[in-house]
Amino acid sequence: MKSIEVHTDGSCLGNPGPGGWAALLRYNGREKELAGGEANSTNNRMELMAAIMALETLTEPCQILLHTDSQYVRQGITEWMPGWVRRGWKTSGGDPVKNRELWERLHAATQRHSIEWRWVKGHNGDPDNERVDVLARNQAIAQRGGLATS
């Protein structure tokens, strides 16, 4: 089974507003960057999309170390999801789970992989997190119709 390192991030200019997501996949010294965006989104949706797109890109089962600065994504997939499913996609307070379609898609994308979800503090000097942050922000800027920066 291939061992892949993944770094993800999402960005939103306003919340809601133009959003971007990005992922960096690393395997055997090779890297692949993925990025995209939506004209009207939220930060949480973009964080979810980054993880979804990274996992859906992989064509075979992999051992994955996935770094995210989103506690929403990490806790959602590792802690909250079993309860949501058990309660018919309701939160512990009885409300419908937000972004359910993305959570279902993320859950499906995780099934063939062995994944360790690792939280990294955002904007704290981690070079890979900073890299995907810039990529995601540039996608959000492009969705707004602005010029991306490096």
Curated annotation (Swiss-Prot):
Reaction(s) catalysed by this chain's protein: Endonucleolytic cleavage to 5'-phosphomonoester
Annotated positions binding Mg(2+) 1: 9, 47, 69
InterPro entries: RNase_H, RNaseH-like_sf, RNaseH_domain, RNaseH_sf, RNaseHI
Record keyword RNA-binding present: no
Cofactor: Mg(2+)
Cofactor note: Binds 1 Mg(2+) ion per subunit. May bind a second metal ion at a regulatory site, or after substrate binding.
Positions annotated to bind Mg(2+) 2: 9, 133
Pfam families: RNase_H
GO cellular component, one term: cytoplasm
Localization per Swiss-Prot or TrEMBL: Cytoplasm
PROSITE patterns assigned: RNASE_H_1
GO biological process: DNA replication, removal of RNA primer
Enzyme Commission (EC) number: 3.1.26.4
Keywords noted in UniProt: Cytoplasm, Endonuclease, Hydrolase, Magnesium, Metal-binding, Nuclease
Recorded superkingdom: Bacteria
One MF annotation (Gene Ontology) recorded for this entry: nucleic acid binding
Domain RNase H type-1: 1-141
PANTHER family: RIBONUCLEASE H1
Function: Endonuclease that specifically degrades the RNA of RNA-DNA hybrids.
Oligomer and partners: Monomer.
Record-stated family: Belongs to the RNase H family.
The name this protein goes by in its record: Ribonuclease H
Protein encoded by which gene: rnhA
